[in-house]
C-alpha cells in the first residue's frame, strides 16, 4: 500500500471532510466552507464608486451654475429691447461658443459652423439652441420656452409647500354647523376617539348625545338625560376606548355612564367629619373636573373642593385608588381647580387656587415632582392645564386672563405668556392642534359687549396668528379632534359649534350636512265643504263664518260647549244632588253624624205643667200616700256647713 507524502494533498482532503472521521464523530460535515475575499478587487470597486459619485456631484453642481447664468442672461435680454445688431452679436457669441466646444466633439463643431443667420432676427425668447453639455463652463444659448414653463411649475410647487408648512392654512374654519343644546351655558364637551359621537353638557343639568352618522340637516340630538339630577355638568370625557363617559358635576360624586347614557358606576361619598382627607373613601365637597388615564382602561381622576386629587377605578367604586393632597409652601391645604394626565400617563398635573401648578409622579403621592408656586395670580381659578402631544410642554389657562406655556423638563419659569384673554368661567379650555404647532383658547365677554373669539397662538413664537369670531357670547369649551381635524366649541348662550373644512377634515360634520332634513308628515283632516247658493231661500241659507273672537264668545255662553260647572243647589237636594248640607256626600254625612241634640228647656217647668192634672185626677202616686201620709212632707234644705258637721271624723278634710 502506497502512502502519500506529507507535502501531497489528496482530492478528498480538499473536497470535503474525511468520511471515516464523519462516521466516527456522528455528523455528515463540517459546515460551509469559509468565504474568501479579494481585498484588491474590493478596494478597486470602492474607488470606482467614489469617483463615480464625485463626478455626479460635480456635474450636478456645474449644471446648477449654468442654469443660474442662463437665468441672468435671459433677464438681461428681456430688459434690453432686441435690435438686429444685438441679435447678431448674441448669435455670433453662441456660434463662437459652439466653435470652442467643437475641440472636444467634431460633430458639434460641424453643426454649429453651418448655422448662420438668414433673414430678419428672431425674437429673444426664440433665439437659442441645444445646451452644450460637453463643457459646463462655456455659456450656451438661451433655453427654449418649455424650460420657463417648467420653472414656473417649480415655483408653484414651492409656494404650495410653503402653504402646507404654514400652520394657519391647516385650521379647518371654512364651514361650520350649529348644534342647539339649550339656552344656558355649554360647560362640557366630549368626543369619542373615533369621532363618531359628540356629547354636550350644560348649566341646565342636561347631557345630550349627537351622532354625526345618524343626524340629518336638522342637527337634533338623539338622546337627552340628566345623570346628576339638579347639579350643573362641569366635565364630560370619553374613555380611551370610547365605551364609557366620565361625568363630573357640581356634586361630590362622579359618575361613569356608557355610550347610551346608562349608569355604569358612581363614586362613593366620603365622611365629611374626618379631618385627614386621605382616610376618607371619597370626595366630601363639590367636584371641579375629571380626566381618564390615556393608557390604562378603567382608571380616571377627579379633583374637588376638599383639597384632594383622587384616582379611581371603575371596578372599585367603593373607595379611591390613591389620593394626592396639594399643599402650599407653608404646608397648608389648597383647593385644586383643574387636573389632567400627561400623554404617557406617568404624570399628574393640577392647578390650584393659590396660583400654583403642581405635578406628581403617578406612583408617588406624597411630594410633588414639580412645583411652581406663582404660575398665575393667587385667588384666581386656573381653568385648564393641557399637555402637548410630544409630552414636553404644558399649557395653562389662568383666571388672571393669561395663557402660559411651560417646559416640563425645566419647570422653573414659563416659556411664553400671553395676556388680554378675558375669562369669566371656571372651565375655559385650552388645547393643542393635532400637529402640535398651534395652541387654541377661547375668550369671554359680557352680555351685549362684543363677541367671543377663538384665539390661535403659534407654539414656537407664541404670537397671536389667527382669530375666529364665534358668536355674541363667551367661548367656554374648545376641542380640536386629531382624527377628524375639526374644532368643537361650546358657548355661553347654549350653542355647540363645529368648524370643519371639506378638503382638510374627515367624516364628523361632513356626514350630516349632506343629508336633507326629513319632512314632517301632515295629518289629513276633513274640512266641511261650503256650497254657496246666492239664490237659495233664507231658511236654507247657511250662516256666514264669524270671526274667531265672536265664535269664542258665543261658545262661552253655551254651557255645553264651554263645560260650565253646575251651580250649587239652593234648598233641599234634588236629582241626586245634596242641597244646603254641602256639595259632597261626605260633607252631608258628617253633618248628620255630628248633630247637636241637647235640649235647652227647663225640666222643672215641664213637670209643673202636669201638676194640676195630677192633683185633680191622681192615678199613680197620690192614691198610695192618701191613707199613710195624706199631708205631703218635703225634705228640709240644709246648708253645706251643717252637712260637714254631721260627717264622721275620718271623712272630714284635714286643713
UniProtKB/Swiss-Prot annotation:
WD repeat spans: 181-220, 228-269, 282-322, 331-370, 377-416, 422-467, 470-509
N6-acetyllysine: modified positions: 453
Phosphothreonine: modified positions: 580
Pfam families in alphabetical order: WD40
Chain intervals with Low complexity compositional bias: 99-112
Modified residues (Phosphoserine): 622, 639
Biased composition regions of type Acidic residues, renumbered to the chain: 148-165
Keywords annotated in UniProt: Acetylation, Isopeptide bond, Phosphoprotein, Repeat, Ubl conjugation, WD repeat
UniProt feature, compositional bias: Basic and acidic residues: 45-78, 541-566, 645-655
Molecular function GO labels: enzyme binding
Region named Disordered: 1-24, 43-170, 541-582, 632-655
Cross-link position per record: Glycyl lysine isopeptide (Lys-Gly) (interchain with G-Cter in SUMO2): 297, 591, 597
Superkingdom: Eukaryota
Record's compositionally biased regions (Gly residues): 572-582
GO cellular component assignments: nucleus; site of double-strand break
Gene3D superfamilies: YVTN repeat-like/Quinoprotein amine dehydrogenase (2.130.10.10)
Family (UniProt): Belongs to the WD repeat GAD-1 family.
Name of this chain's protein: WD repeat-containing protein 70
Amino acid at each position: 500500500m502506497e502512502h502519500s507524502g506529507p507535502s501531497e494533498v489528496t482530492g478528498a482532503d480538499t473536497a470535503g471532510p474525511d468520511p471515516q472521521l464523519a462516521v466516527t464523530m456522528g455528523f455528515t460535515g463540517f459546515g460551509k466552507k469559509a468565504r474568501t475575499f479579494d481585498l484588491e478587487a474590493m478596494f478597486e470597486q470602492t474607488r470606482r464608486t467614489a469617483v463615480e459619485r464625485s463626478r455626479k456631484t460635480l456635474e450636478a453642481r456645474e449644471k446648477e451654475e449654468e442654469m443660474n447664468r442662463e437665468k441672468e442672461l435671459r433677464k438681461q435680454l428681456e430688459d434690453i429691447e432686441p435690435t438686429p445688431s444685438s441679435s447678431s452679436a448674441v448669435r455670433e457669441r453662441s456660434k463662437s461658443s459652439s466653435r470652442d466646444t467643437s475641440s472636444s466633439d467634431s460633430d458639434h463643431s460641424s453643426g454649429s459652423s453651418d448655422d448662420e443667420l438668414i433673414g430678419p432676427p428672431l425674437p429673444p425668447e426664440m433665439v437659442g439652441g441645444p445646451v452644450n453639455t460637453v463643457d459646463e463652463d462655456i455659456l450656451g444659448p438661451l433655453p427654449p420656452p418649455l424650460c420657463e414653463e417648467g420653472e414656473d411649475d417649480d415655483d408653484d410647487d414651492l409656494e404650495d409647500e410653503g402653504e402646507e408648512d404654514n400652520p394657519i392654512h391647516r385650521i379647518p374654519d371654512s364651514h361650520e354647523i350649529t348644534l342647539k343644546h339649550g339656552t344656558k351655558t355649554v360647560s362640557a364637551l366630549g368626543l369619542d376617539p373615533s369621532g363618531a359621537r359628540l356629547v354636550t353638557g350644560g348649566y341646565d343639568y342636561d347631557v345630550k348625545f349627537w351622532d354625526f352618522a345618524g343626524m340629518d340637516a336638522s342637527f337634533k340630538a338623539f338622546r337627552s338625560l340628566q345623570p346628576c339630577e339638579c347639579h350643573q355638568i362641569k366635565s364630560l370625557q370619553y374613555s380611551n376606548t370610547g365605551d364609557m363617559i366620565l361625568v363630573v358635576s357640581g356634586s361630590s360624586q362622579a359618575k361613569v355612564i356608557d355610550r347610551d347614557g346608562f349608569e355604569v358606576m358612581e363614586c362613593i361619598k366620603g365622611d365629611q367629619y374626618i379631618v385627614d382627607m386621605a382616610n376618607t373613601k371619597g370626595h366630601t365637597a363639590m367636584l371641579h373636573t375629571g380626566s381618564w388615564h390615556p393608557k390604562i382602561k378603567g382608571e380616571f381622576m377627579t379633583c374637588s373642593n376638599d383639597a384632594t386629587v383622587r384616582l379611581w377605578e371603575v371596578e372599585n367604586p367603593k373607595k379611591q385608588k390613591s389620593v394626592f393632597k396639594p399643599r402650599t409652601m407653608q404646608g397648608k391645604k389648597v383647593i385644586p381647580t383643574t387636573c389632567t394626565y400627561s400623554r404617557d400617563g406617568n404624570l399628574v398635573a393640577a392647578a390650584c387656587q393659590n396660583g400654583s401648578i403642581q405635578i406628581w409622579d403617578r406612583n408617588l403621592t406624597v411630594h410633588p415632582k414639580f412645583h411652581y408656586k406663582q404660575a398665575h395670580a393667587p385667588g384666581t381659578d386656573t381653568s385648564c392645564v393641557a399637555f402637548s402631544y410630544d409630552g414636553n410642554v404644558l399649557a395653562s389657562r389662568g383666571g388672571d386672563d393669561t395663557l402660559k406655556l411651560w417646559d416640563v423638563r425645566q419647570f422653573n419659569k414659563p416659556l411664553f405668556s400671553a395676556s388680554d384673554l378675558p375669562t369669566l368661567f371656571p372651565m375655559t379650555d385650552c388645547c393643542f392642534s393635532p400637529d402640535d404647532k398651534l395652541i387654541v383658547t377661547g375668550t369671554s365677554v359680557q352680555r351685549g359687549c362684543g363677541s367671543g373669539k377663538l384665539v390661535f397662538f403659534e407654539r414656537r413664537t407664541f404670537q397671536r396668528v389667527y382669530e375666529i369670531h364665534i358668536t355674541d357670547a363667551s367661548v367656554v369649551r374648545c376641542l380640536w379632534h386629531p382624527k377628524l381635524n375639526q374644532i368643537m366649541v361650546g358657548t355661553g348662550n347654549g350653542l355647540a359649534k363645529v368648524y370643519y373644512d371639506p378638503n382638510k377634515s374627515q367624516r364628523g360634520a361632513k356626514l350630516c350636512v349632506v343629508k336633507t332634513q326629513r319632512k314632517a308628515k301632515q295629518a289629513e283632516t276633513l274640512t266641511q265643504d261650503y256650497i254657496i247658493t246666492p239664490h237659495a231661500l233664507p231658511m236654507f241659507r247657511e250662516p256666514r263664518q264669524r270671526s274667531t273672537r265672536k265664535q269664542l264668545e258665543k261658545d262661552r255662553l253655551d254651557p255645553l260647549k264651554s263645560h260650565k260647572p253646575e251651580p250649587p243647589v239652593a234648598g233641599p237636594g234634588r236629582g241626586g244632588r245634596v242641597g244646603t248640607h254641602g256639595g259632597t256626600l261626605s260633607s252631608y254625612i258628617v253633618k248628620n253624624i255630628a248633630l247637636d241634640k241637647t235640649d235647652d228647656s227647663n225640666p222643672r217647668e215641664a213637670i209643673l205643667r202636669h201638676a194640676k192634672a195630677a192633683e185633680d185626677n191622681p192615678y199613680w202616686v197620690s192614691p198610695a200616700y192618701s191613707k199613710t201620709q195624706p199631708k205631703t212632707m218635703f225634705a228640709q234644705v240644709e246648708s253645706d256647713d251643717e252637712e260637714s258637721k254631721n260627717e264622721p271624723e275620718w271623712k272630714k278634710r284635714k286643713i
